[in-house]
Amino acid sequence: MAGGRGAAGRGPAEPQESYSQRQDHELQALEAIYGSDFQDLRPDARGRVREPPEINLVLYPQGLAGEEVYVQVELRVKCPPTYPDVVPEIELKNTKGLSNESVNLLKSHLEELAKKQCGEVMIFELAHHVQSFLSEHNKPPPKSFHEEMLERQAQEKQQRLLEARQKEEQEQREILHEIQKRKEEIKEEKKRKEMAKQERLEITSLTNQDHASKRDPAGHRAAAFLHGGSPDFVGNGKARAHSSGRSRRERQYSVCSGEASPGSCDILYFCVGSADQLMVHKGKCVGSDEQLGKVVYNALETATGSFVLLYEWVLQWQKKMGPCLTSQEKEKIDKCKKQIQGAETEFSSLVKLSHPNIVRYFAMNSREEKDSIVVDILAEHISGISLAAHLSHSGPVPMHQLRKYTAQLLAGLDYLHRNSVVHKVLSTASVLVDAEGTVKITDYSISKRLADICKEDVFEQTRVRFSDSALPYKTGKKGDVWRLGLLLLSLSQGQECEEYPVTIPSDLPADFQDFLKKCVCLDDKERWSPQQLLKHSFINPQPKMPLVEQSPEDSGGQDYIETIIPSNQLPSAAFFTETQRQFSRYFIEFEELQLLGKGAFGAVIKVQNKLDGCCYAVKRIPINPASRQFRRIKGEVTLLSRLHHENIVRYYNAWIERHERPAVPGTPPPDYIPQAQNSSATGGKASGDTEELGSVEAAAPPPILSSSVEWSTSAERSNSARFPVTGQDSSSDEEDEDERDGVFSQSFLPASDSDSDIIFDNEDENSKSQNQDEDCNEKDSRHEIEPSVTTEAVHYLYIQMEYCEKSTLRDTIDQGLFRDTSRLWRLFREILDGLAYIHEKGMIHRDLKPVNIFLDSDDHVKIGDFGLATDHLAFNAEGKQDDQAGDHVIKSDPSGHLTGMVGTALYVSPEVQGSTKSAYNQKVDLFSLGIILFEMSYHPMVTASERIFVLNQLRDPTSPKFPDDFEDGEHTKQKSVISWLLNHDPAKRPTAMELLKSELLPPPQMEESELHEVLHHTLANTDGKAYRTMMSQLFCQHSSPAIDYTYDSDILKGNFLIRTAKIQQLVCETIVRVFKRHGAVQLCTPLLLPRNRQIYEHNEAALFMDHSGMLVMLPFDLRVPFARYVARNNILNLKRYCIERVFRPRKLDRFHPKELLECAFDIVTSTANSSLPTAETIYTIYEVIQEFPALQERNYSIYLNHTMLLKAILLHCGIPEDKLSQVYVILYDAVTEKLTRREVEAKFCNLSLSSNSLCRLYKFIEQKGDLQDLTPTINSLIKQKTGIAQLVKYSLKDLEEVVGLLKKLGVKLQVSINLGLVYKVQQHNGIIFQFLAFSKRRQRVVPEILAAGGRYDLLIPKFRGPQALGPVPTAVGVSIAIDKIFAAVLNMGEPVTVSSCDLLVVSAGQMSMSRAINLTQKLWTAGITAEIMYDWSQSQEELQEYCRHHEITYVALVSDKEGSHVKVKSFEKERQTEKRVLESDLVDHVMQKLRTKVGDERNFRDASDNLAVQTLKGSFSNASGLFEIHGTTVVPTVSVISPEKLSASTRRRHEIQVQTRLQTTLANLHQKSSEIEILAVDLPKETILQFLSLEWDADEQAFNTTVKQLLSRLPKQRYLKLVCDEIYNIKVEKKVSVLFLYSYRDDYYRILF
């Protein structure tokens, strides 16, 4: 085209040539641009005769192609010869997607453009314009109605699918949430039971100590026990256990922000052992340790539902991983990875450590992510706080508590050092204290190693804050002792020790100073080891002889308080001496239970009144009597005393006490009194002198009540027995005085004439009291034996308040109050009622917020914490109180005002917040209430920033701005009330009374009493319409999918194993065979029974309601339903057995009752005077035990007792007959270890039993032994009253008969008489018995009851009808805990082979299936259990795996290729054989194989039984007297170390092999048993000889050198290293004199040393 423009400028000499050239050039360009869309329409375009251009262009929208093109046009251009000076003909053809109007418009545009372009080539410009036009009009064609309908239907379907998917996902989330919630509930329940059990164990140990050591010089027991203290110990201990919980754990670390969202829950997997895996749900972040670079998370181990802690190190690479790394950087990265691998190797040894004073490690895992390496460690979950947190909150630790901590720290540290583990970073942050006060050491060894890896320069250093302490870092075990000394010094001083060299304060006790010197001395050689420190006098102080003999009453107080609550948690425990306690009203009248909260003002303590047994909250405030703050406090306490309303926390009493405590040198306290430089051991004072106010320094303390305490409430209720306190100074006269004086008691204060000063003395009286006190102090100081210690006088104001047990409104809001609208409005109305009452009394709360609104145990509101409340009095223009007003109350009105600026920023009203000089009235509380109502109505806000933002939006001056998700129809009323309350103009804000009367509030709910009355009447008329309506509504309730899923989630855990089901079937079949040998038949009774309170008086059954409202119960046992069945069917002779489920109710709601499988065997006979049924029943259980080797190993004993003998003993001990049933319950709980001895004594005390009766009772019930040995004790009862003698004679006769019959039947178990055996005495009469063994669980020996039963003749008549006649049969029954037999068989060392069938028939193809079916039918007919494989397409490996999983020994392979033969494969003893058998001979062949297999198993079982019998007698004891030296049996320790895991029977076989081989050699050794050890290994004789080259007597380095040399010469280095480590442990740690190394492979041994 450029050429064309050039040609136009040429002269007229050659016009024809220039036109043709320009036309040709343009055509060439167009063909190149449009390609196949270009078409030359001239017939002879290449001919010699030149014709003007005529072309056709197919055009589309510009830049589009394919499915996006909806329009198209063909542009046809015919040029004249003189083109481009003459306009060409333009035509549009074959248009698509354009209307006629659009085509005409386009054509007119083209014609205009052609005229403008005349003289220039224009076809390309025309084509470009067409493309632009098409782009503008490129629209899809309009759809038909049908197409639109289909599209709409598709969209609706897609929307429905999306909604269904969202609903399904929501249900899944709810189910997962419910599962997590249930797991937490189950875990908390387990935790509660475990803590209660631990509490009982601790109390048992304390009881033993009391019996051994708590004696005064006169030989009497401690006063706390004499005064009925034991029940309180137990009850309050439980309350402590409940109230600790996980909240303390969460306070252990600083709150972690930014690490993980609270809702995140990752799943992590940890390898444990060779193949096992732990699946752990990672919970929220609970803290971080910058020093060690770790983050701590709560986690849940899914297999057991146990809570664990997850320690996580995230090692962030400085540079992204990739090919750009240098070789030096790659070397550093490889080095770090090897270091982490080394840490994992070290961790494998740490997992084995277990000690009460260290936190256990469970598993470790490291994983590489995109830009980091993440290391996770699972550790034991401890419910407690770290000593660092304790240090920051509570200050110095009292010395007696510090001594306890030190002993436990040393025990844990010594255990680590004995196992060659160095802690490396021992500090207050790495020591935890759980809810029971037990110290646990964590972060040992591995944490320091991982922290050091974090320091590598290939990692970012932002996550770790390395120590900048001036203290030197000391390594090794002595370094741990150094850090222990620093830790203890920090605890004693209340702050971290940072100075070097360490200076030990001289005011510490001398023994503690010496202890610290032994820890922090600079020379490592002089520093003591933990073993030496455990023997230090600070840990084991010498008992001091008292100067004055102390009475039991005096000695009991301190112990009593300390037993209830750790003294380090109560501010008073460290400072109040015993003498001060004796004259303190607080300690005389109250018993401290729990610290509820602390703040700048002092502390709030939960106490129990010793007289009425009720719990109260006591606020203890240190005060300065000479300060202005003290006068303000007096006025506020006076105001609070006037409040008495059901929605206001009640203030009962208030008084002041003066105490003296040791002064801290150099730092006098705020209320320090210079005159009080007397001894802390003040002499006795009269109770009336407790209030002594003296002159104090002019400087007043900081404002005490400037902020309110955030209360930590407790939901538990003390179940302690209440006893009147004796030996105290309080009397009934003082109690009467308290009642007369009203709320504020004056029993400890002189009378006051001032109306305003209800409690306090005037100045003259104060000074007089002080002078008297000084005189007394001077007089007492002359009699001091030791030099006086500097003390300071402290005055405390005690305010006794109502204790709210449940929670605060903040807790309720966070738990989702917004979901329960009715409860929300009820609580809001109660808050309004309380506020209206306060305002009516002329007061303003001024600090109203959710944490200051409490809920009691009945879920009623209690407004409390009036620390900022003030009297609503009129102020004059100068801001001073009107003197004429006095103490009178002026009613509030809109013009009333007060001055001040206090409160919490988010809740305070604008008039208070705006200016310090602003005046306000009672409506400031209504503004706060508006914020509170919004929080009650809105979902809990997750983060603090969200809460601040939302609440600040509500406080907008124009109008409240609600969140978007609050703008719906459900919150219309709430929005109206909130908007009214949050009006920034106080005049437009309602009063509490106006709002109560407003129609915006829903009507008040029906009073509970009225509701109860209606329900009572409804339930009383079971035929009425109201009753039917109520039942109908009850049974119309809908269960959500989450509830449906979690109802039985603990039963259906998804871990079904076919082997377990087969074991259960095998056990049941074995037991049934025993029963059938005695002629018993299976008989199952009806499942449900009507509720019967008398039968299950003590045991709680699972109750349900049928559609008519009748209460029925699932069977608690199988005995009662059978007795009912026998009575209703007049059965006189029957032997029956039954294996059925029994049920226990769950304490958690919406859970399936707990199912237990029980086996019952009963004999019913019309013979009344025979003991043979009882003996046969016992013998039957003996036979069951003999059927299972796993039960034979447990050495069961048979305990017998007689209900008449038990009754005779109780009557002989002076227990009235009307209290026997209660005593039976107590004794039953004691036998089943539900109660400790102390709790038993407490319950007996409640029955008003004398101490003599208890002593005599214990004398009898603790007796157990052979009948022959106990006969004299039993005969001593015959000399008593006639009734008792007859009971004893009858019971003794029965016992003698049963014992004799058992001997005749050949029962070889030990038969003992247990006079304390109590088993369902209400159901039985006659002989009762138990089969009991003792097993070790968790380092404790616990009784395990396999079976229990007895004679129950008197139970049957209780179920007979009123018209029933005829004799009553005799019945004896026994119940077997069959689940314990299942567990015993499953856990056997030698696994039991259980197969569902004898032979598996497999078809090799579809064609052979009919032959396989016929063959299976023949096997079934012959009585052979066979199974046919349905899926014939499985491979050989899959078939073999199926047989292994189902423990199938024989397989018959049917194939057409084999003709009339069948391949029989057998998988026996890890070897596979194959044989071709004729199809007709298959049945006989299989039966022969099965007979051979049964014979082999019988022989093996007999051999195992003999082996078990030998083992029971002792591994190294025999009848011939071998191994006996000087009359003492030598029983050396045998350890079997195998490269593979051995079963128990195999291990026992090796032990007996050692016994036989070495018995002569051992008999000739003159050594004690503890000096000999045998190590049995799986090594050849040549390797045993190589061990003689090891250097045993050299040091550790030389020994390791010889070990390396040995390993370099031999294979199996890992196994050899394990053997060498065990030998070294025996030599060095155990210090054994003689060691035999025995090869059970070659039956060869050598003595190594």
Curated annotation (Swiss-Prot):
The histidyl-tRNA synthetase-like region and protein kinase domains are necessary for eIF-2-alpha kinase activity and eIF-2-alpha-mediated translational control. The histidyl-tRNA synthetase-like domain is necessary for binding to uncharged tRNAs. Kinase domain 1 is a degenerate kinase domain. Residues 146-205 form a coiled coil. The modification N6-acetyllysine is found at K1259. This is eIF-2-alpha kinase GCN2. Residues 239-249 have a biased composition (Basic residues). It comes from Rattus norvegicus. The keyword Phosphoprotein applies. Autophosphorylated; autophosphorylation on Thr-899 is increased upon amino acid starvation and in UV irradiation cells and inhibited in presence of IMPACT. It is found in: Cytoplasm. Residues 1022-1493 are annotated as: Histidyl-tRNA synthetase-like. Its EC number is 2.7.11.1. The gene is Eif2ak4.
